[in-house]
């Protein structure tokens, strides 16, 4: 959710409906899985298509009808949740078997080698790609005359990152291999990072968030870009709905409750600006990990739900305040 929410916030908008979209698309996925006799591909495709439709509806209202995103997605939060209750009759939809759960509990098991050895090989490949990419980025900055970390610090940073990544993959190799969900998240992060950093669409998103009027004057179709941002958010929310349904092994009418708060908090913790124009995919993932640690920590402390909500509210307020404080200080 955070990888899509960061795009919405970069454009200066917000999406309060993602939790309800998770619930509705998760219910659709469970229903489709049962109706197609356990066809995971059909269930996921139908759920993602529902996410496209939901995102397109909200995007049209925001981008072309010029209704504030806060109002549109607030209505979506209520409307999609209501449709979920109607669709499920306020009852969980159980899955016909455990096949769907493979998305969250399965492991990559290649036919050409042992899963544990594959985990180590994949770790080496990932580290190699990360180091190569960082070195090429550094060389490009040197060529353009930009400031860089001193070479010893650069090497130390990359050595630390490589050690952490290899440790993670080593732990995978000691278990049953690389979890499918980890591969899914990794592919999503890499794809979204590439889109934001190397495509016209990604640069347009940043331009609109930085100065929408200037972006329009420079020839950017702001309405179309904002529309696609909300469509993409709908697809990612649907993907989250599929994963959550697989994790729970059933679709719950109350699924996704307060997910929008966690996603928004993750984006701001990850460095996005409340005024738009600033934010990264990697930052939102780091913010999501921080929120996950906070949630797990509070659960381990047996902290009541009411206190957990207060803590999350404080975290969100502090993250936004810190961003505004930095902006004011730099100005």
Give the predicted meaning of each segment:
Residues 135-149, 190-230:
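Membrane-helix/interface signature in polytopic inner-membrane proteins
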Residues 128-140, 285-331:
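C-terminal transmembrane helix and the adjacent membrane-cytosol boundary/short C-terminal tail
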Residues 37-77, 286-287, 291:
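Alpha-helical transmembrane segments within multi-pass membrane transporters and channels
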Residues 55, 230-243, 247-313:
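Transmembrane alpha-helical segments in multi-pass inner-membrane proteins
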Residues 20-24, 41-49, 71-74, 119-120, ...:
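Hydrophobic alpha-helical transmembrane segments
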Residues 77-196, 253:
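Transmembrane helix-bundle core of multi-pass membrane transporters
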Residues 69, 98-99, 113-123, 177-183, ...:
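Loop-to-transmembrane alpha-helix initiation sites
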Residues 1-36, 60-70, 196, 214, ...:
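Single transmembrane alpha-helix segments in multi-pass membrane proteins
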